[in-house]
Amino acid sequence: GSGDILLLQNEISNVSFAMEEARRRGMQIAFNASPITRELMEYPLELVDYFIINEVEGRALAGVASEEYDRILEGLAEQFPNAAIVLTVGEKGVLYYNHGKRLSHGIYAVKAVDSTAAGDTFCGYFLAGLTKGLPMEDILKYASMASAIAVSRQGASTSIPTWEEVIHFEE
């Protein structure tokens, strides 16, 4: 209901229905546009509050061929003026854009063992930060830390760190 956030990925059927129903219930919608499909552009994407996407997905959604991050962000902001854009850019970290506010956060250097859960961990910690009401700078930091910890471990769900591990990561 109201105050909740629904995270959708493009891996289920009825994404459009889920978006419309979430909005009807007053929920915020976070959308990870993976995998990119032709049908995706038929979804009611104007309902999305947060796009959490990588650069390939960003280019496709923005309709730009450019690999320049600024062009991707500008294209997404034009297409989806009411949404915050969270663009993950691999080893360069993450870029955030919302109504003219731009932020970025680098990655944390770790020995990568298994990247299986990196994106899911980032999404989970990003949304956890939102629900905790943290400042966006801290949300990006903690989501990046959590993702770094996850790639330093073997496995998928077993690699996801606890909140305690994340907040003590730099110490």
Cite the ranges covered by each PLM segment:
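Conserved phosphate-binding/catalytic region of the ribokinase-like
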Residues: 38, 69-171
